[in-house]
Amino acid sequence: MSNPQQQFISDELSQLQKEIISKNPQDVLQFCANYFNTKLQAQRSELWSQQAKAEAAGIDLFPSVDHVNVNSSGVSIVNDRQPSFKSPFGVNDPHSNHDEDPHAKDTKTDTAAAAVGGGIFKSNFDVKKSASNPPTKEVDPDDPSKPSSSSQPNQQSASASSKTPSSKIPVAFNANRRTSVSAEALNPAKLKLDSWKPPVNNLSITEEETLANNLKNNFLFKQLDANSKKTVIAALQQKSFAKDTVIIQQGDEGDFFYIIETGTVDFYVNDAKVSSSSEGSSFGELALMYNSPRAATAVAATDVVCWALDRLTFRRILLEGTFNKRLMYEDFLKDIEVLKSLSDHARSKLADALSTEMYHKGDKIVTEGEQGENFYLIESGNCQVYNEKLGNIKQLTKGDYFGELALIKDLPRQATVEALDNVIVATLGKSGFQRLLGPVVEVLKEQDPTKSQDPTAGH
């Protein structure tokens, strides 16, 4: 049976060789250094994440170890281990005595199980013992001010059993097997105070219109206001990739979001092709939104031209756009009479759920007879309400609303609403209308225009 440590080294070197063949770096030494630094960073990040979870659970992930013995093979063996948890095989009563574990092995006759090395998951848990000394403060292994056992010269022969100081040895512990993604913390209130400016690229009118159309239905940019969308489009950079070029690599950190202008891109997960995308499609959004590795490898199936948006610009524009939209809508909603019964918290949730739509003079916002799916609040501009039976009914302006009747009673639109000039409306879908408006729905029912002589006011 091969040595586990040797097998681990062999696997790592094999993986490194595959990476070198795949990416063909010019500077092999630097590539190898970056490769192992990235692996080390990921391992340490996971280790300290587990430590934080353990502390939150009241568990000492780094129990103190006074001495280690060295066996005849030169392997350090921990004596007097002080585990931070008790045997899972004992009585279920959490207050019972767990000191005796009938399944525990004699460490004197099974020293190999207690060997420490080759990673945090290869140490003996010694679950039969419970901690007798209080845990001491954790030590950062990277702190140069702290002594390390690795820096002590080996002054004893391999056959001697001597005691040497040892740094704290982490207990293998998985506080929570479920993993999650996260994003860097950015404080939107401080964004206005720094000097950061988004990049601006000189695009032709045709290019701007094409990119705006491509972004129109993208779920990340759909909620941005007009100014934020213009900022995104102006910041896009054109990148060209030859056929068979790896655009993004599965497992790498996300750096760019891409929109395909021309060509075809194939996507692979674990070397298996899963899909393809072509002109007008986009990819790479999630790795920019969240601090998580790329979920797939993207390879240019043909010569490809893409528009790319870098991570910092992506995060800043989205965050600022969302933050500014919330502030604007919260102020706007406070002035609408029918919404004054909402609490500040409910108003904030409603502000986050609203979407902005723009219409030009003559555009029909809703049409008589159509099925209603949205509720509308007029932010600016003027609208005319009319139907075939009564003709012009009334005009609506800033702060007015329409479309509620079709959602409350699940009826077709009772009238057409047309923009008299440039109009900006905030829209709320049917599910959000029922979920977020709460007591306001009852008020709207009381104001049901079908109860009056004007059956079209609710549209």
Swiss-Prot record:
Keywords: cAMP, cAMP-binding, Nucleotide-binding, Phosphoprotein, Repeat. Residues 95-109 have a biased composition (Basic and acidic residues). Residues 78-109, 125-168 are annotated as: Disordered. Residues 146-168 have a biased composition (Low complexity). InterPro entries: cAMP-dep_PK_reg_su-like, cAMP_dep_PK_reg_su, cAMP_dep_PK_reg_su_I/II_a/b, cNMP-bd_CS, cNMP-bd_dom, cNMP-bd_dom_sf, RmlC-like_jellyroll. One of its GO terms (biological process) is cellular response to starvation. 3',5'-cyclic AMP 1 binds at residues 220-335. 3',5'-cyclic AMP 2 binds at residues 338-454. The modification Phosphoserine is found at S180. Residues 30-219 are annotated as: Dimerization and phosphorylation. One of its GO terms (cellular component) is cytosol. Signal peptide: none annotated. One of its GO terms (molecular function) is cAMP-dependent protein kinase regulator activity. Belongs to the cAMP-dependent kinase regulatory chain family. Tetramer, composed of 2 regulatory (R) and 2 catalytic (C) subunits. In the presence of cAMP it dissociates into 2 active monomeric C subunits and an R dimer. This is cAMP-dependent protein kinase regulatory subunit.
